[in-house]
């Protein structure tokens, strides 16, 4: 059991010894040193730096700082509470004061305490006050720093989240810029080589712009889908009707055609994809596409490519044009009949060379 000491008002008695009262600044309890009546030295030692309640404090004694709460044995606690009930006090401290006043004659016979033991108490209490203030200030500074650090850490975390969240947007915008640049360059290149990348097919039975059929495919629309070999554009074979100002274009670019799947193990792949090779020309630079720059080496290259084609494939591609070929041709232009004859001559010459070899 525990009994609190020094919670009540002063009881007096005992020739002024043990006299207690209120004094000092701030309403703190001041207890006179035993045998020194009216001393204002505070013997209360605050445990908490912020003060707190009186029951959380300790007191200065001749043997050092001690707790204000006293632990009693079971028998002593029973006797004490019985005495408190008989006295009619509602607080244990009042019963303790009554006992001290009643035992004052016996207390006078006891040896007095050494006054030198209490000489350092006022100085210790005075020194403890600045120490408490400094400790309070330090704790406040630490709490402020911890709050600022937590706030700064929170702000740092929020900055990181904003950066991470904005990173995909930046990456997306950069990708869009790249795509826009590629599209612009592809559009510019397509505009330059438009006439060279297309094959014009004319209807001999019609004249003017009506005899031209318009078939076009955009090579930039499927950029990246075609294999590397598909980047080779169509050769510059243009067949136009007489008097036509512009021939319609029919592009056979391989990037618009899907590559055939690979054959199974042990099987032969009989499929083929349409490319510029069927027309017997592989374009180099833009300047080499004009008919005036066709060299002998270019013709030899045509013959090698024509050897890979059989008669059925050629008749399939150009049979309709040969049947409906217009007999009249303007000067300086190659008609469809002349083109077929030239093509057939290339094929026969290639077959003869192959038979000789």
Swiss-Prot record:
One MF annotation (Gene Ontology) recorded for this entry: sequence-specific DNA binding
Residue ranges constituting the TCP domain according to the UniProt record: 52-110
Pfam family, one: TCP
Chief place of localization: nucleus
Locations listed in the record: Nucleus
InterPro entries: TF_TCP_subgr, Transcription_factor_TCP
Comp. bias (Polar residues): 142-155, 284-295
Disulfide bridge partners, by residue number: none
One cellular component (GO) term of this entry: nucleus
GO biological process: regulation of secondary shoot formation
Biological role: Transcription activator. Binds the promoter core sequence 5'-GGNCC-3'.
Protein name: Transcription factor PCF6
Taxonomic lineage: Eukaryota, Viridiplantae, Streptophyta, Embryophyta, Tracheophyta
Gene: PCF6
């Amino acid at each position: 059991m525990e009994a609190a000491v020094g919670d009540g008002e002063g009881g007096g008695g005992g020739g002024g010894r043990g006299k207690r009262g209120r004094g000092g600044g701030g309403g703190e309890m001041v207890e006179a040193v035993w045998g020194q009546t009216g001393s204002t030295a505070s013997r209360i030692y605050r445990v908490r730096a912020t003060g707190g309640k009186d029951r959380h404090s300790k007191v200065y004694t001749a043997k050092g700082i001690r707790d204000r709460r006293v632990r009693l044995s079971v028998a002593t606690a029973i006797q004490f509470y019985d005495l408190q009930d008989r006295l009619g006090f509602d607080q244990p401290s009042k019963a303790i004061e009554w006992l001290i006043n009643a035992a004052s004659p016996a207390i006078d016979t006891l040896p007095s305490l050494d006054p030198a033991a209490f000489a350092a108490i006022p100085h210790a209490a005075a020194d403890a006050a600045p120490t408490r203030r400094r400790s309070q200030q330090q704790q406040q500074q630490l709490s402020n720093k911890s709050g600022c650090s937590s706030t700064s850490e929170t702000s740092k975390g929020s900055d990181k989240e904003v950066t991470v969240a904005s990173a995909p947007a930046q990456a997306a915008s950069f990708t869009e810029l790249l795509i826009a640049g590629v599209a612009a360059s592809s559009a510019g290149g397509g505009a330059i080589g438009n006439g060279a990348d297309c094959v014009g097919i004319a209807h001999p039975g019609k004249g003017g712009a009506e005899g031209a059929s318009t078939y076009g495919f955009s090579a930039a629309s499927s950029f990246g889908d075609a294999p590397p070999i598909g980047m080779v554009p169509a050769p510059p074979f243009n067949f136009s009707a007489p008097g036509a100002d512009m021939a319609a274009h029919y592009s056979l670019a391989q990037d618009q055609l899907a590559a055939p799947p690979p054959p199974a193990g042990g099987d032969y792949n009989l499929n083929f994809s349409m490319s510029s090779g069927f027309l017997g020309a592989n374009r180099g630079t833009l300047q080499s596409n004009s008919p005036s720059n066709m060299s002998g080496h270019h013709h030899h290259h045509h013959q090698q490519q024509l050897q890979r084609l059989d008669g059925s494939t050629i008749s399939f591609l150009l049979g309709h044009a040969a049947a409906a070929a217009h007999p009249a041709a303007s000067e300086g232009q190659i008609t469809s009949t002349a083109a077929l004859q030239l093509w057939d001559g290339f094929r026969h010459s290639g077959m003869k060379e192959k038979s000789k070899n």
